Amino acid sequence: MLKSVFVLFLVNYLNSVRCLEVPDAKLEAIYPKGLRVSIPDDGYTLFAFHGKLNEEMEGLEAGHWSRDITKAKNGRWIFRDRNAKLKIGDKIYFWTYILKDGLGYRQDNGEWTVTGYVNEDGEPLDANFEPRSTASTAAPPQAGAGQAPGPSYPCELSVSEVSVPGFVCKGQMLFEDNFNKPLADGRIWTPEIMFPGEPDYPFNVYMKETDNLHVGNGNLVIKPMPLVTAFGEDAIWKTLDLSDRCTGLLGTAQCKRDPSDAIIVPPIVTAKINTKKTFAFKYGRVEISAKMPRGDWLVPLIQLEPVNKNYGIRNYVSGLLRVACVKGNTEYIKTLVGGPIMSEAEPYRTANLKEFISNEPWTNEFHNYTLEWSPDAITMAVDGIVYGRVTAPAGGFYKEANEQNVEAAARWIQGSNIAPFDDMFYISLGMDVGGVHEFPDEAINKPWKNTATKAMVNFWNARSQWNPTWLESEKALLVDYVRVYAL
């Protein structure tokens, strides 16, 4: 009986919805922040608004905005969110509902795109956030008369692009994390859980362990630790399967390693986090305050990586931007390196990297490391001092790379002069240990050869040499903040 009553009510409700046309809602983006939705009053007793930002509604779901308004004001029913931060190009999907004379009426499938801003009084604003002048007698330009209709922007637009809809103003801060709160997986950063492989084949596995990845004293902390510390003395000779939580490609060596006579499981646990799922950008200025780690064969990763790898997935053919790198050995700790990488092997691997040699080790204290990336050039600076600039040559990087036998370089011809650095990149922070490309064979006290089958075994067998250099107070990469600005 109850079910029958409900069905009858539902039929009556749906029929009633068809009997009266709900007035179109007026949506307004308010500067500097706010959303206002309203309809004119016509004797209604309730107005409800349900909507989502940049995501379609699934039927009659509640949505991000879900509000019932029970009283009209000055002849209109008004929903207001005073904290909404809307950008040009943002799209709101919504449905509305009204009650009149005890019956409900609904308007579905609403869509609205932000094309400009208004002030609190509803007056449209110009590019300077001032009300558009109504005193001028000159008619506005018409479409087809030299100016196409389109949105008005409250600022001078930047060449920078971001991975979320909307416009970007010149000099606008696009991203900031001061690491004042614990890492929340996926909220901003995603920890990588995998075995890194080609092209550098470092001697570590990325994991999310409290001892090697955490936030403390306002800093991101990433440090290395032997695998045997976490998993026992024979861990390097046992299969390590990360498949149930691996962020790499399942079914490959990125998620599972089996040891053999010549190959051990990577003997060091480090960490790496990225913003691939939450934030990526094209062109901008990256500023990162960090204290570099000290210890033999430690390689801090402070870099930008391509989201889609449109020019190829192997050997850095889609590019890698090193914001800063100071290797931890005593012979390297006074040498800062930054810039673009477009090949895994020499001589082109380091052809465009720039160096800044200091009188004091870069590992002693925090420094502000900056990389500015534009459609024409990539510029590196530290503490406000520019130490390197790579300008895209006429015709792009193809010619010089082709001369160095970089086979995939021909793909860059499809892009702009700065290709492969003309696509979206995300932020990556982490640490590698050793590997087959970062350290030349002539490095002091290096216990392995880059081309040796037992390179990782030889590294591990020499732990009595390098492990004492990993002091607890020095071996961590510390990051105070990460900021990205539009050009």
Swiss-Prot record:
Keywords: Glycoprotein, Immunity, Innate immunity, Secreted, Signal. Residues 157-487 form the GH16 domain. It is found in: Secreted. InterPro entries: BGBP_N (IPR031756), BGBP_N_sf (IPR043030), ConA-like_dom_sf (IPR013320), GH16 (IPR000757), GH16_GRP_C (IPR035806), Glycosyl_Hydrlase_16 (IPR050546). Residues 20-119 form the CBM39 domain. GO terms for molecular function: carbohydrate binding; hydrolase activity, hydrolyzing O-glycosyl compounds; pattern recognition receptor activity. The keyword Glycoprotein applies. PANTHER family: GLYCOSYL HYDROLASE-RELATED, GRAM-NEGATIVE BACTERIA-BINDING PROTEIN 1-RELATED. Monomer. This is Beta-1,3-glucan-binding protein 1. The lineage of its organism: Eukaryota, Metazoa, Ecdysozoa, Arthropoda, Hexapoda.
